[in-house]
A protein has these predicted regions:
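S-adenosyl-L-methionine-dependent DNA methyltransferase catalytic core
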Residues: 1-55, 161-165, 173, 183, ...
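Core alpha/beta nucleotide-donor-binding catalytic domains of modification enzymes
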Residues: 2-137, 144-156, 163
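Conserved S-adenosyl-L-methionine
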Residues: 78, 167-178
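Short glycine-biased active-site loop of nucleotidyltransferases that positions the nucleotide triphosphate
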Residues: 89-90, 180-183
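Short, histidine-centered active-site or binding-site loop motifs used for metal coordination
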Residues: 110, 142-144, 288, 325
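Short beta-strands and strand-loop turn motifs
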Residues: 137-143, 172, 322
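Short acidic/polar capping segments at secondary-structure boundaries
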Residues: 144-145, 176-179, 195-197
Length: 375
């Protein structure tokens, strides 16, 4: 197996310079305008541009993500959205606000501190911008566990706050695996609209399922496991589409595997799991910088390449990556599934949420909000 030192040596080779002509420029004729908050490397922007939108403002505090964003879109995002000078740069009028607000406070992979974590309170910055600018549509995304955090109270507070701002609020859980990528990545999606309620029914009917094998590189420098690690039981297909092809947790140590298994156990708090290329992949992590996920393909166990990780998130082949290898894994793990965002954006347009409304909808009466997904 190739060592960490060799991987780090390759990091400089993978550091891409900013391009003179960024590959993803805004459309000349846009159907709507949007602002991109907590923009990361631009997953939301790619999806909404594919749906016909034009970005008029972006904000991201992470320097590495800012560089990647600039390399692809030709503009440097504004910084900390909590600062008055950043919010002052937001255009007065725009049609849609999108925000994948920080998920670590609500994620199983994080410490699930919720609003106790300062990142968990950033959603209130979104509320302030909504109140000031009154966009026609607000599109929010977070981890599936937001639904269960603090016994559902966290999500209930968010939904009620959105309703009190005078928006029709609808939410559901969508899985990236239904939108043409081989990844079991479930996310809470919230759509807030002024004109009329949004319906998730058409999106819930999407079942464009694919398998991981169709997204893998056929040639390249792959990092394989040695035979000492490949004591594989019979594969097990899960309802999620995941196919486990390797021992889990302590079991792998009970069958005489090399003590160096510690290297394998760094897999995003899901130790010693190997996934078959005939299924889908679990959600790429947002915190494990080494990105060590292993797959069984053509009888061999190997690590997913960087290109494959970006591909199973729906990023185009010409997407520019910047930073060291670990940074690039972290950036893609923090992003969103591009085809899913594009599908949501197209459905928002199709349902007529973005044309100018004759008037704003009256505020929705606050109350106990059901935690059942809305259509």
């Amino acid at each position: 197996m190739k060592g960490e030192s060799e991987e780090l040596m390759r990091s400089e080779d993978l550091r891409l310079a900013h391009v003179d002509a960024p590959p993803f420029t805004p459309p000349e004729r846009a159907r709507f305008t949007f602002i991109d908050l907590f923009a990361g490397i631009g997953g939301f922007r790619l999806g909404l541009q594919q749906a016909g939108g034009r970005c008029v403002f972006s904000s991201e505090w992470d320097k590495g993500a800012q560089e990647t964003y600039q390399a692809n879109f030709g503009e440097m995002p504004h910084g900390d959205i909590t600062l008055a000078e950043t919010q002052a740069a937001i255009p007065e009028k725009f049609d849609l606000l999108c925000a994948g607000f920080p998920c670590q406070p609500f994620s199983i992979s994080g410490k699930m501190r919720g609003f106790e974590d300062t990142r968990g309170t950033l959603i209130y910055e979104v509320f302030k911008i909504m109140e000031t600018h009154r966009p026609k549509v607000v599109l929010l995304e977070n981890v599936k566990h937001l639904r269960y955090h603090d016994k559902g109270r966290t999500l209930r507070v968010i939904l009620q706050s959105l309703e009190e701002l005078g928006y029709h609020v609808r939410w559901t859980i969508l899985n990236a695996s239904n939108f043409g990528v081989p990844q079991n990545r479930e996310r809470v999606i919230i759509v807030c609209t002024l004109q009329k309620p949004f319906s998730f029914v058409p999106l819930a009917m999407c079942h464009n399922r694919v398998v991981l094998r169709d997204f893998l590189d056929q040639e390249g420098e792959f990092e394989y496991m040695t035979d000492a690690y490949t004591l594989l039981p019979k594969t097990t297909l899960q309802d999620s589409g995941l196919i486990f092809a390797g021992y889990r947790n302590k079991r792998i140590r009970t069958v005489g595997v090399n003590p160096d298994t510690l290297h394998l156990s760094r897999v995003h708090k899901q130790p010693n799991r190997i996934y078959s290329a005939d299924g889908v992949h679990p959600a790429l992590p947002s915190q494990e910088s080494s990105g060590r996920f292993w797959i069984l393909n053509a009888g061999q166990v190997r690590k997913l390449t960087l290109g494959e990780c970006y591909r199973i998130m729906g990023f185009p082949e010409n997407f520019c990556r910047t930073g060291a290898i670990g940074e690039q894994y972290r950036q893609v793990g923090n992003s969103v599934c591009v085809p899913m965002v594009a599908a949501i954006g197209r459905e928002i347009v199709k349902q007529g949420m973005l044309p100018s409304a004759d008037g704003q909808s009256p505020p929705v009466s606050p109350g106990k909000h059901s935690l059942a997904p809305t259509e």
